[in-house]
Amino acid sequence: MIFLETGNQFLGTERVSKLMRQYAIPCIISLLVGALYNIVDQIFIANASYLGSYGNAANTVVFPLTVVALAIAVMLGDGCCAFVSMALGRNEVDKAKQSVDNAVVLSVVSSLVLTAVYLIFANTIIAMFGGTVNEETFRHSQEYFFYITLGIPFYMFGQAMNPIIRADGNPKFAMISTLAGAAINIILDPIFIFVFKWGMMGAAVATVIGQVATAFFAVWYLLHMKIIKPASGDYALRGTVCGRMLTLGITSFLSQISLVAAMAAINNMLRKYGALDAVFGQEQYAQIPMAVVGIVMKFFQIVISIVVGMAAGCIPIVGYNMGAEKKLRVRELFTKLLIAEALVGAVALVMAEGFPRQLIAIFGAANESGYYTDFAVKAFRTYLCMMVLACVNKACFIFLQAVGKALTSTLLSMFREVVFGVGFALLLPVFFGLDGVLYSMPVSDILTFIISAIIIVKTYRELNVEGVQKV
């Protein structure tokens, strides 16, 4: 027997701005802390003189492969979160419970399959993501990838359960579980890298230990859920529930997996056109473009973690109010969300354009050549010049997913990352060389925003019409 407590009814009555703060802030912190796993690794790796830009480049190679795991996890977690929120809004508690059970099973099975694939085809996968730029980068990539792969099941489980915990009405616990894992990683990284001199292995092992801690927090919470209380371990997969849950989460998956495709294209174009450059064509500097773009992406990841945290934190609020047919509240939330996201983008833009050298210094620029710093300044100022539009686009993707417009959200996300992102990453270097890779992101964001603006206007109009989609 499972039952619904009255504690979630405030989602339909409390002030929207207060709900946004209550749900978005813990989600932002959770995502920021989650992002810190890889970012902290890269900071310590970059500042270790015996690793330097080779280690940074290796981190850039492996990073997209962890995003594949994240893509599957957030598809299950965000899809389940949206499903549960809408089901609870309609008081369909049985469906909510089944969705959680199925998400748990799918996260465990998919993580084990992905781990096996990574271990079997490691060298081929590393080469696909540009790891053959030079011998040192390839060697560091192999070492880092192997140990990171061992933590994939724990990483995926923790990430999948995080939005489910938020949907159960406990965003603070979701935040704490992620914080605990990241804190462990931050403490262990300098010990393993600088004291024990374990290099890339040390960075990876510190990350995995933190991920294990987060996964154990998630397991504990599943046994003590607040709103949905399972009485028995019925984890049989149900086609209808899984289908709807995966449909709601497919945008999160495609948003992440298409980013992987874009990063693969970018890494390979950096390798190809870097080899044709007078400076970066030299063996000792070949890894610099990849290392630098990896750093720029880490800054972008921090900003997008805030943006996605705001929007994803609002999924339970949107889902509940859509289920309860309170569309004017959803419209109000959408307005406030877009304004907040644009402000975040504006702050990020000022930082990227005005203080690139200070940002680069965090990632060990003092240990590198002048070529490294010069290219990094150019990369920050060019690659991130349309941050405001990028933030609004991302908010639009997730909001559409939250209101049940999975197809529209998916298509918009795919256009941004695959059609525009991958397309321009492959096309522009043909005309502009290495700089063309840097132009690909702002051009993609401008074109995507044109489509987003049209959809935003249409969505506003629809939120004035009575009626609601069924779960």
Regions found by a protein language model. Give the residues of each.
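Small-residue hotspots at the loop-to-helix junctions and early N-terminal turns
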Residues: 53-64, 141, 145, 204, ...
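Residue-level signal for short hydrophobic patches within transmembrane helices
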Residues: 17-36, 40, 65-72, 150, ...
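Short alpha-helical transmembrane segments in multi-pass integral membrane proteins
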Residues: 1-24, 84-151, 195-250, 318-386, ...
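Transmembrane helical elements of multi-pass membrane transporters/channels
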Residues: 22-41, 147, 181, 210-214, ...
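Short runs within selected transmembrane alpha-helices of multi-pass transporters and secretion channels
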Residues: 30, 147-166, 174-182, 203-216, ...
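Helix-terminus/linker motif at the lipid-water interface of multi-pass membrane proteins
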Residues: 32, 36-57, 126-135, 191-198, ...
